[in-house]
Amino acid sequence: MSDYSKTDRLMERGARFLGSRYAIMCGAMSWVSERNLVSAISNAGGFGVIACGAMTPELLETEIAETQKLTDKPFGVNLITMHPQLFDLIDVCDAAGVSHVVLAGGIPPKGSVEAIKGGNNPAKVICFAPTLALAKKLLRSGADALVIEGMEAGGHIGPVSTSVLAQEMLPDLAEGHVMFVAGGIGRGNAMAGYLEMGAAGVQLGTRFACATESIAHPDFKKAFFRASARDAVASVQVDARLPVIPVRALKNKGTEAFTRKQTEVAGILDREEIAMEEAQLQIEHYWAGALRRAVIDGDVENGSLMAGQSVGMVKEEEPVADIIAKLMQQSEDALTQR
């Protein structure tokens, strides 16, 4: 068995919190982070997280049960705070005995943290913290751990880089709280750096998206293998009247068409041929179903290929266990050379 003693020592608190061998979380990726990938990551010593996304409570119940058939190791469930059935989803997690619930996509609504921690099977709550002030508020509100995620990440992103957020937050919070760092991590060297800064662990998504165990379409994986860091771009907002939530994804015909669509709708607005609400809905609904088209159907030209800037380090399909072993070895080598 490989000796990762230096990395293990720095990860000890995070691994204990997660109940896993390594304090390496897999970021929840819609359509990708399902039973196969999640169980594979937990079985390999990491910590898998089911992406609930827009699932109904019934679908989530099935997904958790199927994941539990594939692993007896701990895993988490990522819930979107704006989901209309959030509290029903929390009940599903509680009934299934899920050990950790990750709340993403906004500030947790009133009573949600209490519901997760106060059920028949109390779970630990992990939240995302985009600023130091919000981080402190979330911890006061009962969050057990925080994820600091920078703009290098794939999917929905904030405006500040991982390295800056880590420098702002870890000195203030890492000693007394469990903090994970995410966004742009593709190699163990970076992981080692954040652990030395006080992080209890890390979260990676893009690095695991093309694992052998990932159900993503072969063409989706090939698009990742071809891509460089500069191909993973944040969505562009053309007009302030038509708000666009920043999302990082691989540029393709779909992203180009989206920019044209915004310009077209803005022009119609200028000519007063459409109501503001209808115009905003057209923009909001443009990407409906686009993630599924990319991940499941393999439509890499028109679908949404959410990817972080670390995509340039993803060059081949590898088993999850090999990816985790590489990350740990790279971290250990970096720490040994200090």
Where are these regions (language model features)?
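Conserved active-site-proximal phosphate/metal-binding subdomains
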Residues: 159-178, 186-338
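Active-site entrance/lid segments in N-terminal catalytic domains of soluble metabolic enzymes
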Residues: 1-178
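Residue-level detector of alpha-helix initiation sites
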Residues: 32, 185-186
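Acidic, glycine-rich active-site loops and adjacent beta-strand->loop/helix elements
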Residues: 151-152, 183-185
